[in-house]
Amino acid sequence: ATNDAGEPIPDRLINKMNEARNFTKAMGTAQQLFYSNISLSFYSESPEKINLVEMLKDLQKEYSPYPYVDGTYFYNNFGHLNGYSSNYYIYQWSLAIATDLFSRFKDEGLNNVAVAHEYRRKILEVAGSKPADEFIEEFLGRPFSIEAYIELLSNL
């Protein structure tokens, strides 16, 4: 990478820029996991027993670096909570699956035409025709794993 004058940008600056970019990604992921757990927790509890405020306080303490602010009733402004019900986690789950699928391209080459064709045949063309874990395993040659997702997160 070079600046406007064509001079190389110092590695130190590039590293700092990457650290800053990854910091926001890590915070964003933590926030998504917080939202996912709100969704799963609220919809997993019996309506007669649920105390939304207490549950939110507990989840915020566990998943968020920000303290709960009394009287905010965050869940009332979390629009996805009604539209997605307990399925908000699908954002991170989809990323975990996509990262695992991408690992095959990383291993065999990003421009590997044979792998791309196999991806099309075994993933895109059959989507919805059978359980996802079956066609994912067929493409990867092994069961789905969260290892690639963990590696992605550990590099943030």
Predicted regions and their residues:
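Cation-handling catalytic/transport regions enriched in His/Asp/Glu
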Residues: 1-156
